[in-house]
Amino acid sequence: MKLFYIYPEQIPQGNAREIAILNTFFELSNMCDAKLVLPQSPLNLNEVNEKFALKLKANDILFVRKKILFLKSNKIFNFFLKKIINNYSNKDAIFYTRHLKIAKFLLENKMPDQKVVFEAHECFTLGNKALYDMEKEILQNADFVFSHNSSTLNELKKFFGLQIANSAVVYNGCKQDSDFKKKDFDFSSINYYGSFLLWKGLDLMLDFALKTNIKLELYGKNSGNSFMTLKNTLKEREIENLVCFKGLLPQNEVVKSLIENNTILIIPSVKSDYSLYSTPLKLFEYMANSNVVLAPNFPPVAEIVKDGENGFLYEAGDEKSLEEKFNYIKTLSNEELNKISKNAYESMSENTWKNRAIKIIKELEKIN
């Protein structure tokens, strides 16, 4: 099986999408003849491997020009991508992407025996109605569609009125390289890893901290507009004393920190049009490293977190529900909490990046 994973963005950026793509591709490259197709740009592969704890090889990456002189364009990228498509040695290759416009280009330019596989993580049309026809065409005509949760696949079927028969769910993955670690859980503070954008749910965490007088230790980028907005908000609400900024951790250090963490890990989130699609990557990372997670009860999240079994759920966007569930968790014994965290750890053993790649390969073999 020959596979080209098309990712038309420069790396590394460190966002969740990139983490998922690089880890998935790396595991796929260990199982089949796979190439990661990237825009041509300076790339320190050793740095990328160190940052993401990977072992990507230089000959697994194909660079495609996206820039000529001072002109940078996706059309340039597509022009050179077409050379890969038209190469006769790739006449029966599989082209895999999460990028909507790349998927459209592949469908329009592929050879008869080539296959186009699209991985869906959202409904792009929710943010841009002009994409409706393109997105429907891709979901209808792609040779196979993967979705990162059942809720997303079902919502896309309903939204576009499609069956999407050639499809499967492959949940996001995680690294799980250490044994389960029993912990002495502490409720005096809460660690938070991720974006400092208030609208993504951090605002809910601030309300929770103000109400409970609990300290927050925030791991994230200590610069930029979102950081400054957060700093100003803390000052306005007079809760600066409750928040400690710990800085941005490299991805390989995040896992170490999560293994050592002994606080309840809350995923703050508010309801939006995207609530039926989103499963945060951090959810998998938290659960894979012996933690107790308190997450919003969105349908995609509830596919992973079974309330009271391998984690806990609260009513999304409801500060009162969050506080009540947190207070309930505090009543549990340390032994009971370790049982919950062990269940979380064990449930993630099925969702390693390697197992994700195995599931993808199994489905692709059916169409190859």
Where on the chain are the PLM-derived regions?
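A short, well-ordered alpha-helix in the C-terminal region of glycosyltransferases
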Residues: Y328, E335-E350
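Nucleotide-activated donor-binding/catalytic signature segment of Leloir-type glycosyltransferases, i.e.
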Residues: G220, M228-S257
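Membrane-proximal helix-turn-helix segments that form the acceptor-binding/catalytic region
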Residues: N23-F26, K82-S89, K104, F118, ...
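A short, active-site helix/loop in glycosyltransferases that binds the activated sugar's phosphate group
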Residues: F105-L106, K136-N166, C174-S178, I360
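Nucleotide-sugar-dependent
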Residues: K200, Q251-E285, A295-E303
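Conserved donor-binding/catalytic core segment of Leloir-type glycosyltransferases
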Residues: F4-I6, F146, K181-E217
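N-terminal strand-loop element at the rim of the active site
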Residues: Y7-G14, E27-I76, T152-L153, K157, ...
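Conserved acidic donor-binding segment of nucleotide-sugar-dependent glycosyltransferases
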Residues: D307-G308, F312-E319, Y328-N334
